[in-house]
Structures are given as C-alpha cells and as structure tokens.
Swiss-Prot record:
Gene3D superfamilies: 2.160.20.70, 3.30.160.540
Encoding gene, per UniProt annotation: minC
Main function: Cell division inhibitor that blocks the formation of polar Z ring septums. Rapidly oscillates between the poles of the cell to destabilize FtsZ filaments that have formed before they mature into polar Z rings. Prevents FtsZ polymerization.
InterPro entries: CAP/MinC_C (IPR016098), MinC (IPR013033), MinC_C_sf (IPR036145), MinC_N_1 (IPR055219), Septum_form_inhib_MinC_C (IPR005526)
Protein's name according to its UniProt entry: Probable septum site-determining protein MinC
Length: 246
C-alpha cells in the first residue's frame, strides 16, 4: 500500500479505535489496504484489548466480518465489540469511563479493601485484579480492567467488568438475587449472585461454561438469576429488559 494512501485511516478514541474507510474504493482492494495498515501497526497494538468502530463507508454484515477476520489474522489486537453511533453499549461504556476518570473513588489497592460508606452506590476499580487480590464494596462495582484467575470482587450490588472476567465474582452478597454481572469477556471461575452459585465446570445450557471459540472478537455478556439458576446471555436489549433493579 502506498504510504500516501488514505483509504484506511486508524484513529484512537477514548474507548478504542475508529477505522475510517474510503467510500468509493472497490471492497477487495480496500480489504488489502486494511490488511497492510493493521499489519504495519501490529507492534503498536501488541495484545491490546479494545472496541472498534467503522466510519466513512456503509458496510454489509459480511463485509464487516471479513474486515474483522483480516484484522485478527494480521495483528494481535483483541476486539471486544464493534460499536456504532446508535450502540447503547457505547453510551454506557463512555459514561462509565468518564465518571471513573473524574471520580475520587478510583482505586488501585493491591490488597484486600472494604468500602464501608453506606451512601456509596457504585465504586470504580481501575486496574487488573490479580490472583489473591480482593475488592469489596457495599454497593455496585465497575472494574475498569480485568479480573484474573484467583482475583475476586465482592459486592452487595451488581458488578460490571469492562475487560476480561476470569476470576470470581460475588454479587448481591446480602441475598440480593436481583443483582447481575456484566463482562466484556465472560470466562469466570465462579459467579455467585445472592445465594446462587455457578462455576465454570457446571453443566447445562443455563450455567456458565468456558467457550471453545478462540475468536478474538469477544461478545459482552450478562449473568443474572432466574428461577434459582444463573443464566448467561449476550448483552442485548431484551436481556436488559428482564433485569430488575428493585
């Protein structure tokens, strides 16, 4: 691809990257340019996990899929989701990050922490919770990072992980089965909501199970209690409509 070629432009944003695509270039030629652009930028992205959005060109579902596959093939970029201007998740993500960056409640504690202020409705934890680290809160929790195997979040409210969930989450610890758990990548060792427990080794379609799909395109998911079982679904509007905040 010519160094002066502007058919594919990658720009960073608060939530990930936006790829601007030439509107008139034949798609097959554009696809080659996407491959070249991301191949050249692969060292810059390294193993970064982020959302992606496309601008400048209307893509069919098949074209978008082919572009994502090319990006996955030529780079180590982990794409958690594809955002567009009408995407509700984008608004939620932006608002969570904005509040977290301006909040005095951002925490970097590597040791066991307990938040005891009864007025606290939501706490933010910025960083990765590693094995042996525990974050506790009297309200809900938003983790701006990953929860690694052996890491744990304990909350009286709900838990949202804006990253990979591979550790343990105890939500609604005071018996609140209306609490829920959301993660951009849902692969937990254990989730407990209220008094209901699900482990990664549990069988049954409604229980949590580690997926065998190794695709780098991750789907945000939500875990909630229904009929004394923990269900995990894609984070879509119909799933959100079933959530009670009482």
């Amino acid at each position: 691809m010519n160094v002066l070629d502007n058919s594919v432009i990658i720009k960073g944003s608060k939530n990930g990257i936006t790829v601007f695509l030439d509107e008139e270039m034949p798609f097959e030629e554009l696809l080659e340019n996407v491959s070249d652009k991301f191949k050249n930028a692969s060292k810059f992205f390294n193993n970064a996990t982020m959302a992606i959005s496309f601008d400048g060109r209307n893509l069919s579902a098949e074209e978008e899929k082919r572009i994502l596959n090319v990006i996955s093939d030529v780079s180590e970029l982990n794409i958690v989701c594809v955002l567009d201007e009408n995407n509700d998740i984008k608004s939620v993500y932006e608002e969570a990050v904005k509040k977290a960056m301006n909040s005095f409640n951002i925490s970097h504690q590597p040791e066991r922490q307990k938040i005891t202020d009864p007025k606290t409705t939501c706490m933010f934890y910025k960083g990765t919770l590693r094995s042996g680290q525990v974050f506790e809160a009297d309200g809900s929790v938003v983790v701006l990072g990953d929860v690694n195997p052996g890491g744990k979040v304990v909350a009286k409210g709900s838990v949202i992980v804006l990253g990979s969930l591979k550790g343990n989450i105890f939500a609604g610890v005071d018996g609140n089965e209306n609490a829920f758990v959301v993660a951009l990548e849902m692969s937990p060792m254990q989730i407990k909501i209220g008094d209901i427990i699900a482990r990664s080794s549990d069988s049954g379609v409604n229980k949590i199970s580690k997926g065998k799909n190794k695709s780098k395109i991750l789907e945000p998911k939500i875990a909630y209690v229904y009929d004394q079982n923990i269900y995990v679904e894609d984070l879509e509007q119909n799933a959100l409509d079933d959530i009670s905040l009482d």
